[in-house]
């Protein structure tokens, strides 16, 4: 098969779109060679996820959230709400190894993501930090899978703690309660010797505290060069097209500044080379600047955005990818990876249609879209004995040592590994391989 084609099981011959190398825009002083002729991402294998004894979504994985690769240990972690566990995959081989439960147990899927868990995961060996319903944050010692610390950020009853980021130098977590109104972040100190968590100051994301977040708060990221956290805010103020990225000073527990980002709905956030921030947009607007109507006549204008972390200047608008959730920068191949679970190219209507939806590969050096590759969405089943929630491909992470890319897929009978041995009937993590001729990007 041509390297430009990808067979995802029953999606035989489904076209992967390598978009080539366009003339360079601002390369931020980077002068390394252009990409090799073959940059296509290909499906390597599937890591099937077994149903746990506590699974409550028809015996398969449909509800899951953020994933993370610990680069030092080459271990992939996935917050799996269907199985009330963290799924673990060997990021060197792409094989499933185990599921980690918390004690007391994670909430699991409740019928509402805002009250479910686990949700966010970040690892710094030997500690795994995981968020849960009821504003819960735990530390798990991955040497023995024991829960060694358990705290609450103090949000409204039942609502979850969601995404989080970690400053390993100072031992500080920023944990986001996105479902509270207004949303807020909590600084939590980590005892790097014992894993013990100590809840610190709260940062409220409302107008009185510098940012009028009216539709939640999404992915935080730590920037060691500026010693600041950054956080994507989908909507600031009453206008749906106005979002932004805020810069947070963890030492004063304040929002220092807001970098406006329009026509995007910022969700995913990743720190790339040259102090760039890659923003995964979670809303599709049209070319007239309105929220895209799939039944209308105005074309969709899907995009992700790259800004300068120090100035907030928009360095590039990457058209043709999005909308999605989590994004990732892989220093091993110099690419950003962007989910596209809400892409205008996905099967519609979303509530009843299942099928492939494109994720994106973006060259961090050239700041151009290189490729779209298929992932998979599954709609909810709301009647009968097999009821389950919808599942969308909104989570992504990569291993910089071997450039394997990991995308969890909800349970389906359409996806099969290239060797025909692994399927996704109970949910899986799709493992993609990508050989890139570029050297690492600093």
Segment roles from a protein language model:
Residues 18-442:
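Predominantly soluble domains enriched in secretory-pathway, periplasmic, or organellar proteins
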Residues 9-18:
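Bacterial N-terminal signal peptides
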Residues 1-9:
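Bacterial N-terminal signal peptides that target proteins for export
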